[in-house]
């Protein structure tokens, strides 16, 4: 079954065996046999780079990377699928460095065979037979659904950004 791998422990997690005991006493679960990496380059940025690289070099690990550059992680992938850039898809952004919410509208048509991460996951869901309504939502609908709170989607589209109403520190 799918699970999320913590970027901080990805090196160790890719090297763990099935049922191995974690430092907190929990069982690790089944060995990771397949991995889809997107919006990240763990081989270059994750801690414990030796373990991360060793994990990605496993012959029995099936890895797909959604990317618009051939990154260090993409070098270890079985498949690299061309992902759109920020200029080519809908998105909503917040940041660690500021307190604004930003809408990202596509300014360009995707080049070549590039698709947004969400479009790639929708196609994968369809191929796997998932017919739930949530797998039909387009990127703009997902961006709209991601916005909760005091800033309406249409206002954000009109202005492009909004200061989040957070208490002063």
Residue ranges of each PLM-predicted region?
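Extended redox/cofactor-interaction regions of prokaryotic respiratory oxidoreductases
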Residues: 1-75, 85-92, 155-169
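Catalytic cores of large soluble enzymes that bind and process phosphate-bearing ligands
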Residues: 2, 6, 27, 44, ...
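Short acidic (Asp/Glu) and glycine-rich catalytic loops that position anionic groups and cofactors
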Residues: 31-36, 97-106
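Flexible domain-boundary/linker segments
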Residues: 52, 80, 90, 141-142
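Short, well-ordered loop/turn and helix-capping segments at boundaries between secondary-structure elements
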Residues: 58, 62, 79-86, 123-133
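Short low-complexity, flexible loop/linker segments enriched in glycine and/or proline
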Residues: 79-81, 96-99
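Short beta-alpha connecting loops at secondary-structure transitions
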Residues: 84-87, 100-110
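N-terminal leader/propeptide and maturation segments of large enzyme subunits in energy/redox metabolism
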Residues: 108-169
């Amino acid at each position: 079954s799918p699970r999320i791998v913590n970027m901080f422990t990805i090196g160790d997690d890719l090297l763990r065996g099935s049922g191995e005991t974690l430092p907190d006493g929990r069982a690790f679960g089944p060995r990771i046999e397949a991995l889809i990496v997107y919006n990240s380059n763990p081989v270059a940025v994750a801690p414990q780079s030796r373990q991360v690289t060793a994990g990605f070099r496993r012959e029995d690990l099936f890895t797909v990377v959604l990317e618009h550059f051939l990154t260090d992680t993409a070098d270890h992938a079985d498949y690299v699928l061309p992902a759109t850039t920020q200029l080519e898809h809908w998105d909503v952004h917040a940041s660690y460095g500021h307190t604004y919410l930003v809408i990202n509208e596509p300014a360009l048509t995707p080049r070549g065979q590039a698709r947004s991460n969400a479009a790639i996951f929708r196609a994968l869901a369809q191929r796997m037979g998932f017919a739930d309504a949530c797998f039909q939502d387009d990127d703009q609908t997902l961006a709209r659904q991601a916005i909760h709170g005091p800033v309406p989607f249409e206002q954000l589209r009109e202005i492009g950004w909004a200061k989040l109403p957070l208490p002063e520190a």
